[in-house]
Design a protein with these regions (language model features):
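Low-complexity, acidic Ser/Thr/Pro/Gly-rich terminal tails and inter-domain linkers that flank the onset
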Residues: 1-26
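Short beta-strand and strand-turn-strand segments in soluble, beta-rich domains
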Residues: 11-12, 58-72, 114
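Contiguous beta-strand segments within globular domains
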Residues: 20-37, 84-85
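A short beta-turn/strand-edge loop motif at beta-sheet boundaries
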Residues: 25, 38-48
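A beta-strand/beta-hairpin structural motif
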Residues: 63-92
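Short glycine/proline/serine/threonine-rich loop/turn segments at secondary-structure transition edges
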Residues: 91-102
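Enriched for extracellular/lumenal, surface-exposed ectodomains of secreted and cell-surface proteins
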Residues: 103-112
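Short beta-strand elements
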Residues: 111-126
């Protein structure tokens, strides 16, 4: 019964981009930089994480999860996970967006639950 009242962890996400560009004609997005996930609440164990790029407010693009985050991750209160990331994602259709955000979700328990979202960062267009 206690599992029914499990609280969503208090997490904060931050992306510090070195490269953030959408190539409209090549139908791809390239992101590189450092992704930081900070635990602003109690000790927590994170499982079944996924990352989604939200561009232009509506376009959602799945991103590969860093290797260290693919297994169960235990975070103490106030701790941070830092990963250098470098994604180049091919798109099915051209995309033009001036900014984007990265959303951290969990699919634990069979449902998609958002855990944290980065602040919007500029997305260049080529």
């Amino acid at each position: 019964m206690l599992g029914l009242f499990k609280k969503t962890p208090k997490l904060e996400a931050r992306f510090e981009p070195r490269v953030a560009v959408g190539r409209e004609l090549a139908k791809e997005v390239q992101l590189a930089g450092e992704l930081v996930l900070r635990n602003a609440g109690r000790d927590v164990e994170l499982t079944d994480l996924e990352l989604v790029l939200v561009a232009g407010g509506t376009r959602r693009i799945d991103l590969a999860l860093p290797e260290a985050w693919k297994r169960s991750v235990r975070m103490a209160a106030g701790s941070e996970l830092r990963e250098r990331v470098d994604w180049t994602v091919k798109l099915a259709a051209p995309m033009r967006a001036s900014s984007a955000e990265i959303q951290v979700n969990t699919t634990a328990g069979g449902k998609h639950r958002p855990l944290a979202m980065t602040s919007p960062f500029p997305l260049g267009n080529e």
